[in-house]
A protein has these predicted regions:
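Active-site-proximal loop/hinge segments that shape catalytic or ion-binding/gating pockets
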Residues: 1-72, 79-169
Length: 169
């Protein structure tokens, strides 16, 4: 499967027609003005979110892994980090924003094959990452598939990274 095939599959899927960005509803006003900013871009635009997704340790890890200036998107509306943000109270009014799969064509798109700031997670250009994504499980109804829950858990850790400010329309 190539990038165009993946984008087409996302757009026509009955399960996930978008890729997603999770945040707290309190952050929508700045996103309407500036788009979805990376952690590095936020202070440059004088944007200081009241409810952030990462804690100080994750921000340090993001810098170490070279993803601090990336915008994070995910493939499902059930990302493990979103769950942690709700549980820890970092996103009391959490929402998922549906983002067009067209952003996958932007230069610099990478995929973290796991939690992006974990030291052992591979981060690959999207074209190289596609063969590692469980497309069948993501975009078809296969809840009775072998090893459904471990496979789904792995998918819920994937993260797309972008080095630009994406403004949702």
């Amino acid at each position: 499967m190539n990038l165009e095939d993946l984008m087409s599959l996302i757009k026509t899927s009955r399960k996930h027609k978008y890729i997603y960005h999770f945040t707290d509803a309190d952050n929508l006003k700045s996103m309407e003005t500036f788009g979805i900013l990376s952690k590095e871009q936020q202070p440059q635009k004088l944007v200081f979110p009241r409810f952030t997704g990462g804690d100080s340790a994750s921000r340090t890890s993001d810098k170490f892994r070279g993803i601090y200036n990336d915008v994070s998107l995910c493939l499902t509306r059930n990302h493990q980090m979103a769950f942690r943000c709700r549980k820890d109270g970092r996103h009391p009014n959490q929402i998922y924003l549906g983002i067009s799969s067209d952003v996958l064509k932007f230069p610099g798109v990478r995929v973290a094959l796991g939690l992006a700031n974990a030291h052992t997670t591979k981060i690959l250009p999207i074209e190289q990452a596609i063969p590692n994504i469980d497309i069948e499980l993501l975009y078809t109804w296969v809840e009775d598939a072998p090893n459904f829950f471990p496979r789904m858990s792995a998918l819920e850790k994937l993260r797309f990274s972008f080095q630009f400010a994406y403004r949702a329309k």
